């Protein structure tokens, strides 16, 4: 892995963060449009992705802020900041929780790309922690051994060598102040104890039921009697918790 002067996860964090806010998020009233917000209708849901016609809640903080697509992940990052960790430590902690609660978006078996700005140096660093393709992935392997004309769209033979953990390790080693023991603790605990399915994640599970049923292990973790769990039900992933505990203990 190499950093290039010039992290992309689903997170943006900084220890000293300022955002210019509009005084009127719906636009400035004009003669043609005296009430620009009149047609904005509140939408239900967790707003994990944002909703048409409605912005997310504003957060103003003096000492640090954490923004993710999941409240548990944001809480994990905030705890790290409150405990004395820096923005990179918090980003890794939040990312690890997302690897548990948001596996339709991210996971420790995936890749990691990051942008890190160091204010003291006035430098922007980019990290590409994409995994390598397995050495056995040859045209002959797919055609002769698997009977395929191309790389499949799912399954073990569709995934490259995981790069996420190496990326987390590189970030912590280069820019962090903590290690896996501290930054992975909340994620491991959530995988062990379970997490509730909000509206967005429940909808994702319902839409993925058929694909999840096609894989016995995925069905065991994410489905109940071949169906998505009811809204707000608790999911647990003990095997993932074991993997996270091993990384805490042994590192990359």
Segment roles from a protein language model:
Residues 21-75, 79, 87-252:
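Noncatalytic scaffold domains of N-terminal-nucleophile
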Residues 5-16:
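Bacterial N-terminal signal peptides
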């Amino acid at each position: 892995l190499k950093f290039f002067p010039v992290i992309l996860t689903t997170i943006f964090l900084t220890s000293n963060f300022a955002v210019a806010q509009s005084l009127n998020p719906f636009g400035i009233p004009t003669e043609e449009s005296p009430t620009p917000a009149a047609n904005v209708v509140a939408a239900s849901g967790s707003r994990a992705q944002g909703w048409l016609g409605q912005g997310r809640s504003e957060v103003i903080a003096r000492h640090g802020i954490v923004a993710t697509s999941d409240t548990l992940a944001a809480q994990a990052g905030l705890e790290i900041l409150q405990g004395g960790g820096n923005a990179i430590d918090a980003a890794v902690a939040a990312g690890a929780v997302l690897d548990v609660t948001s596996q339709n978006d991210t996971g420790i078996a995936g890749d990691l790309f990051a942008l890190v700005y160091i204010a003291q140096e006035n430098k922007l660093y980019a990290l590409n922690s994409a995994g390598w393709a397995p050495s056995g992935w040859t045209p002959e392997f797919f055609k002769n051994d698997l009977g395929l004309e191309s790389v499949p769209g799912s399954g073990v033979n569709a995934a490259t060598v995981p790069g996420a953990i190496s990326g987390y390790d590189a970030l912590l080693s280069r820019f962090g102040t903590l290690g896996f023991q501290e930054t992975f603790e909340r994620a491991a605990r959530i995988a062990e104890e379970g997490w509730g399915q909000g509206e967005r994640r429940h909808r994702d599970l319902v839409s993925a039921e058929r694909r999840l049923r096609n894989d016995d292990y995925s069905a065991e973790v994410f489905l109940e009697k071949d169906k998505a769990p009811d809204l707000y039900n608790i999911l647990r992933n003990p095997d993932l918790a074991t993997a996270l505990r091993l990384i805490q203990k042994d590192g990359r």
